[in-house]
């Protein structure tokens, strides 16, 4: 399921979209470093949470952000005073209109050296949820949908692919995000 006109492997891109993507790719590493310098002083260590959301056909829910290239598991930062579960519930609702109806299962906590030397991500497996509809595109999420694990979009991140593989193939988690 995709938003109309946004297939995961679209080869045609309008010139304005190509220019925005080129600019984003050029500035993305610097922006990431700048944000992590801020977070270092504001928070010391950063914690994130992501969900491997699987429907009854074992299709996995992925999101495509407006500010970073590729497809990812839904999730985000854990706020001060917030539990991992509460952060997961908030992020799933914000990014996918997904409401937890059962308890998510912790898959693992991973060191994400790609983001910074202080970043850790808790990954949960979510099989019991409710979603009334896909969300409309917004300033954070450009597209989202459920995908067969054997037919993920080409630009799905390496860490996302690894987590999906671990969950669906019952593999032991690798300690780093990648």
Give each language-model segment a name.
Residues 2-18, 70, 139-178:
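Nudix hydrolase/Nudix homology domain
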Residues 14-50:
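Acidic, metal-coordinating catalytic segment for phosphate/diphosphate chemistry
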Residues 110-133, 160, 167-171:
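Active-site-adjacent beta-strand/loop module that shapes the phosphate/pyrophosphate-binding cleft
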